Design a protein with these regions (language model features):
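Bacterial N-terminal signal peptides that target proteins for export
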Residues: 1-9
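Surface-exposed, well-ordered secondary-structure segments
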Residues: 21-182
Length: 182
């Protein structure tokens, strides 16, 4: 191999590594179990998937109960989604990334009429982007499945939070797609 072709090979390899490092990562919660081993509902304080740690943004302020997440099944598809298990106190769900990411797209489903908010934060806890809906898409007819919808935020993102449901409502994240910063 000549020096020029060796250098060309190394540059090609470096370019391929650069492109691969920015590939989109997908989380789908399909490894979550509908019931825990003891038969109890699937409420957890923390969930980790592909290095992303899901928690509530803060502990409950209106009760002494432990803040928990839950996995919720979309009836029409069987897909599993993650949501706040706090039915009487709306607490945002937080997803913290192991390294900064440049964009996050979440596929959600929710109670009819629920507002939805997706916020992106940098490592200094500053909001860098926000997406919101005053009311999520609803069913066209009563027999239709609850529809999915997407929300996207961009920036130098350390973590995101999603929220919006009022007492008794839910907002479930079906799939989280993110692109690591290069």
């Amino acid at each position: 191999m000549t020096r020029a072709s060796g250098l060309s090979f190394l540059l090609s390899l470096a370019a391929a590594a650069y492109v691969c490092s920015a590939e989109e990562v997908v989380l789908d919660f399909e490894n979550a179990v509908p019931l825990l081993a003891d038969g109890q509902a699937n409420r957890v304080a923390q969930w980790e998937e592909k290095g992303v740690v899901f928690t509530l943004a803060h502990e409950p302020r209106q009760s002494k109960g432990k803040g928990l997440l839950m996995f919720f099944t979309h009836l029409a598809t069987g897909n599993k989604g993650i949501a706040s298990a706090m039915a009487t106190e709306s607490i945002p769900v937080r997803a913290a990334f192991p390294k900064p990411v440049s964009s996050v797209t979440i596929s959600f489903w929710a109670s009819t009429g629920t507002p939805a908010l997706l916020e992106a934060f940098d490592a200094s806890d500053n909001v860098v982007d926000r997406a919101s809906l005053p009311s999520v898409p609803g069913r066209k007819t009563p027999g239709d499945p609850v529809p999915f919808f997407n929300m996207t935020v961009k920036g130098s993102i350390a973590y995101i939070q999603f929220s919006g449901p009022r007492e008794g409502e839910y907002l479930a994240a079906d799939e989280v797609r993110f692109t690591p910063l290069r």
